[in-house]
Amino acid sequence: MSKKKILITWPLPEAAMARARESYDVIAHGDDPKITIDEMIETAKSVDALLITLNEKCRKEVIDRIPENIKCISTYSIGFDHIDLDACKARGIKVGNAPHGVTVATAEIAMLLLLGSARRAGEGEKMIRTRSWPGWEPLELVGEKLDNKTLGIYGFGSIGQALAKRAQGFDMDIDYFDTHRASSSDEASYQATFHDSLDSLLSVSQFFSLNAPSTPETRYFFNKATIKSLPQGAIVVNTARGDLVDNELVVAALEAGRLAYAGFDVFAGEPNINEGYYDLPNTFLFPHIGSAATQAREDMAHQANDLIDALFGGADMSYALA
């Protein structure tokens, strides 16, 4: 029996690539240059499944162009806002993501952003690299400690809970809001206080972490009203999705001192981010590295393979996103 064919749009960790090649005829696109949507659709004519990344924006107009032989789209990411699930359902295309491998890695980056923002690490690092450090001074780069401060977590799924676990080690008070309340045992484990509204959570959050998925309901929720509800001088971090944030208003709040600091790993329109962030000293910015740990990326790649294996192996597909 001939092997099924799959297109992998970016190079994956070698172990995952080797696994895919054992089971399928693999067409693997390199990362230089990046694959275009037109190239992906053209190649899709000769394969049975696509293994994509968040760089390939599969909106409805793209899904409508994908040939009928495509049975599955598996994405090498926890997020799936780059795929129009309704369009895939209408076409009978199964969709899966990699939800588990990134949890700890992303929570670690969120914790790093909290620490780096609170202690003004980016400013200090820049001072060293630009050879502008004048030497120790009593009031230079004075930041905030984390202990006994309230961390508000918006989105208490696996990453939000993993962040709570790490913040406990810094003696932070954990508060959260989610549309689905955690179990009483989880709340006890993380010593987490549930708020029944976002406004209630915001009002006590000296530190505020965005850990919600990008949906029509959450998109650009972090806006003027949200910022106004936070305590004066709050610190906000985002490891979720860039389009949760209204960047113009965040930049203005940072310039005015309404927000003390922002630590962001994700941005709307990345890699082209809002110009206002570049010159602000009170930002601690990373280039979307939340899952960039060796084991996490390997786990993600294997999970992306799992969905394709399940489809072609006739396994239960009830867990698929579409």
UniProtKB/Swiss-Prot annotation:
The active site is at residues 241, 270, 288. InterPro entries: D-isomer_2-hydroxyacid_DH, D-isomer_2_OHA_DH_cat_dom, D-isomer_DH_CS, D-isomer_DH_CS1, D-isomer_DH_NAD-bd, NAD(P)-bd_dom_sf. Optimum pH is 6.8. It is an enzyme of class 1 (oxidoreductase). Its EC number is 1.1.1.29. Pathway: One-carbon metabolism; formaldehyde assimilation via serine pathway. It catalyses: (R)-glycerate + NAD(+) = 3-hydroxypyruvate + NADH + H(+). One of its GO terms (molecular function) is hydroxypyruvate reductase (NADH) activity. Optimum temperature is 45 degrees Celsius. Keywords: NAD, Oxidoreductase. NAD(+) binds at residues 158-159, 178, 239-241, 265, 288-291. One of its GO terms (cellular component) is cytosol. Gene3D superfamilies: NAD(P)-binding Rossmann-like Domain. The keyword NAD applies. Pfam families: 2-Hacid_dh, 2-Hacid_dh_C. Induction: By methanol. Active on hydroxypyruvate and glyoxylate. Belongs to the D-isomer specific 2-hydroxyacid dehydrogenase family. Homodimer. This is Glycerate dehydrogenase.
